[in-house]
């Protein structure tokens, strides 16, 4: 997930010009890959290209920190029919090609316990560079609720502030 990294890893500041850019991984992924802070890591991902071609790309990162799995949130990933609602990884029905034969028992166990909770977090600016499309550079905007605030009042307050700045 592309996020303001300091929200899940306080003390880690992402500098946009830093090369390779930082990535924060959860402790499950760190154990699986046997990595720690300071190690290099290559991220492989898909990018939609016009006209609807799915292309595999890779990017290099430096592990800036390891956080507990609880630092993540399964709601960071948008709901995606055919994926989010699948009871198992083997049950995925994505609209893009994927080799489900690569799914290991450990991956199924992760899905069962944590669903769409991200395993890695990159700075939002880097995510926008990597995954920007003709539809935009963000899939969602998350607005945290401060202690003592009511979440049901958040849409009204956000709309008021947005209108005031237009």
Locate predicted features:
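Alpha-helical transmembrane segments of bacterial inner-membrane membrane proteins
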Residues: 1-166
């Amino acid at each position: 997930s592309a996020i303001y990294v300091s929200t899940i890893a306080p003390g880690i500041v992402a500098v946009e010009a830093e090369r390779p850019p930082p990535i924060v991984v959860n402790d499950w992924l760190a154990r699986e890959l046997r990595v720690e802070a300071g190690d290099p890591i290559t991220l492989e991902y898909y990018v939609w290209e016009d006209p609807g071609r799915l292309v595999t790309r890779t990017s290099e990162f430096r592990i800036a920190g390891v956080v507990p799995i609880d630092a993540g949130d399964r709601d960071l990933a948008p709901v995606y029919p055919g994926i989010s609602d699948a009871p198992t990884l083997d049950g995925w029905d994505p609209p893009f090609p994927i080799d489900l034969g690569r799914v290991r028992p450990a991956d199924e166990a992760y899905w069962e316990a944590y669903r769409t909770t991200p395993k890695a977090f990159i700075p939002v600016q880097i995510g926008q560079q990597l995954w920007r499309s003709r539809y935009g550079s963000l899939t969602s905007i998350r607005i945290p609720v401060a202690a003592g605030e009511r979440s049901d009042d958040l849409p009204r307050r956000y709309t008021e502030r947005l209108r005031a700045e237009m």
